[in-house]
C-alpha cells in the first residue's frame, strides 16, 4: 500500500514541477500581440475570404498595422476602409479597383433542384451562411452571406452562382454627394 502512495506522491510532484516549468516558460517567452493589429482585426468583417490577397482577416490586419493599404477589404467595402482610416489616423483611400469602387453586393444562390447535398459548400463557407444536410438540398441565408464567392468552386454540380442583391428600401443608401444640402454648424446659426 505504501508503494501506491509513493507512486501517487511522485506523480503529483512531477505534475507540479512540470506545471511550474510550463508556467514560467509561458511568462518568460510570451509573445506580445500588436495592439493596433488587434484593433484592426476587430474592425474587419472576419469573412476570411482572401479577396485582399491575404489568407484571412488576421494576416491582413497585421499587414495593415505594418503600413499596408487599408482599401483591400472587398466584403467590408467603404465602411471598413473609413473605420480603418480613422483608427490609423491616415487619409481614406479609394477602394482597390473600379469594381470595388461601386460594389454591387452579391450573395450566393443555390439551384436547389440540382443540389446533390454533398455539403462541400457548407464546409467552404467561412460565415456559415449555407444550411442543409447530407444528401438533402442546401440553401443560403442571404442576410449572413458576405458574397466572398468561396462556395462556388467546390460545388461538383455547378449549382451555385453569385447573384446581385436587389436594391430595396431596406438596403438602399443615399449618395450624399449628389444631394445639395448645406450643413449649418450650431456656432454659425446662433
From Swiss-Prot:
Family, per entry: Belongs to the 4Fe4S bacterial-type ferredoxin family. RnfB subfamily.
UniProt keywords, alphabetically: 4Fe-4S, Cell inner membrane, Cell membrane, Electron transport, Iron, Iron-sulfur, Membrane, Metal-binding, Repeat, Translocase, Transport
InterPro entries documented for this protein: 4Fe-4S_dom (IPR007202), 4Fe4S_Fe-S-bd (IPR017896), 4Fe4S_Fe_S_CS (IPR017900), 4Fe4S_Ferredoxin_RnfB (IPR050395), Elect_transpt_cplx_RnfB/RsxB (IPR010207), RnfB/RsxB_Proteobac (IPR016463)
A Pfam family matched in the record: FeS
Protein name in the entry: Ion-translocating oxidoreductase complex subunit B
Residues holding [4Fe-4S] cluster 1: 49, 52, 57, 73
Ranges where the 4Fe-4S ferredoxin-type domain occurs: 106-135, 136-165
Organism: Serratia proteamaculans (strain 568)
Signal peptide region: none
Complex formation: The complex is composed of six subunits: RnfA, RnfB, RnfC, RnfD, RnfE and RnfG.
UniProt entry tagged with the keyword 4Fe-4S: yes
Region (Hydrophobic) residue spans: 1-26
Gene coding for it: rnfB
Amino acid at each position: 500500500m505504501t508503494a501506491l502512495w509513493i507512486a501517487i506522491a511522485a506523480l503529483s510532484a512531477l505534475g507540479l514541477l512540470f506545471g511550474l516549468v510550463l508556467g514560467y516558460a509561458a511568462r518568460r517567452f510570451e509573445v506580445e500581440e500588436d495592439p493596433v493589429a488587434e484593433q484592426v482585426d476587430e474592425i474587419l468583417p472576419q469573412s476570411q475570404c482572401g479577396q485582399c490577397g491575404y489568407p484571412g482577416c488576421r494576416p491582413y490586419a497585421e499587414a495593415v498595422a505594418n503600413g499596408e493599404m487599408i482599401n483591400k477589404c472587398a466584403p467590408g467595402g467603404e465602411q471598413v476602409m473609413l473605420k480603418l482610416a480613422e483608427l490609423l489616423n491616415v487619409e481614406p483611400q479609394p477602394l482597390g479597383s473600379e469594381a470595388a469602387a461601386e460594389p454591387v453586393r452579391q450573395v450566393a444562390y443555390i439551384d436547389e433542384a440540382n443540389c446533390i447535398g454533398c455539403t462541400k459548400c457548407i464546409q467552404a463557407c467561412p460565415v456559415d451562411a449555407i444550411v442543409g444536410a447530407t444528401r438533402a438540398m442546401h440553401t443560403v441565408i442571404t442576410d449572413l452571406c458576405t458574397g466572398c464567392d468561396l462556395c462556388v468552386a467546390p460545388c461538383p454540380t455547378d449549382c451555385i452562382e453569385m447573384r446581385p442583391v436587389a436594391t430595396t428600401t431596406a438596403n438602399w443608401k443615399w449618395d450624399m454627394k449628389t444631394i445639395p444640402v448645406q450643413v449649418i454648424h450650431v456656432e454659425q446659426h446662433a
